[in-house]
């Protein structure tokens, strides 16, 4: 690692580590209400009705609505990359959710809307995605040029159709350990993986 990048990394960690540790120690309430900085890693959650994840044996992930995410001008060189990232969003989300989830529930991706009992539906809207800057990631060191994604995710009881909770979350990925800072597509994928892991943590909290 370059000396300048190492110095930046040390300074950033010294600043954010205590705050991150403190945030991770906060209890995660499951009573109805709207909470910011909930649990260890959630920006905002609105709990409409509490539930127990062990009461469900199946989780259906529906395709994310990507039509709300702003697109760059078609002349921009990363227009195609953004379109590809949005098209792959649900697939990437599944890749991140399944391995992280501790609950004993089968996870499937489907566009249908089941009315089955003991089934949760995960659906959401991609609010924004940004590839960041590969040059920034390569030359700027830790955190610079990071890609990002933001989504609003609903957790729904399939049988009743009622929304149980709404999570608003943004994630960044800096491609720190990728050669050349990682391609734009790679780091956007990483940000979606991180988002999906966050949703797994939310589900596992409701016990």
Label for each model-derived stretch:
Residues 1-22:
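N-terminal export/membrane-targeting signals
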Residues 7, 44-46, 108:
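Short alpha-helical segments and helix-capping/turn motifs at coil-helix boundaries
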Residues 21-95, 114, 201-207:
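A structural "domain/chain start" motif
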Residues 23-36, 103-104, 109-162, 174-182:
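Surface-exposed short loop/turn segments
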Residues 65-70, 129-131, 170-174:
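Short connector loops/turns at beta-strand edges and beta->alpha or beta->beta junctions
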Residues 76-83, 144-147, 156-205:
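Short secondary-structure boundary motifs at beta->alpha junctions and helix caps
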Residues 94-106, 131, 172, 200-207:
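Sec-exported extracytoplasmic/periplasmic mature domains
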């Amino acid at each position: 690692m370059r000396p300048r990048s190492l110095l930046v990394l040390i300074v950033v960690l010294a600043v954010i580590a205590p705050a991150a540790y403190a945030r991770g120690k906060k209890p995660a309430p499951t009573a109805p209400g709207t909470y910011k900085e909930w649990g260890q890693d959630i920006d905002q959650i609105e709990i409409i009705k509490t539930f127990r994840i062990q009461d469900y044996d199946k989780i259906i992930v529906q395709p994310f609505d990507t039509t709300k995410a702003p697109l760059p001008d078609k002349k921009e060189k990363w227009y195609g990359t953004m379109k590809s990232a949005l098209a792959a969003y649900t697939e990437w989300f599944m890749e991140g959710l399944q391995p992280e989830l501790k609950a004993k529930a089968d996870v499937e991706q489907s566009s249908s809307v089941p009315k089955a009992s003991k089934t949760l539906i995960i659906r959401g809207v991609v609010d924004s995605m940004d590839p960041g800057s590969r040059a920034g990631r390569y030359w700027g060191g830790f955190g610079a040029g990071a890609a990002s994604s933001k989504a609003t995710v609903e957790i729904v009881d399939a049988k009743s159709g009622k929304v149980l909770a709404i999570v608003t979350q943004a994630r960044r990925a800096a491609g720190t350990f990728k050669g050349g800072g990682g391609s734009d597509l790679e780091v956007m994928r990483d940000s979606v993986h991180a988002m999906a892991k966050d949703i797994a943590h939310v589900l596992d909290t409701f016990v």
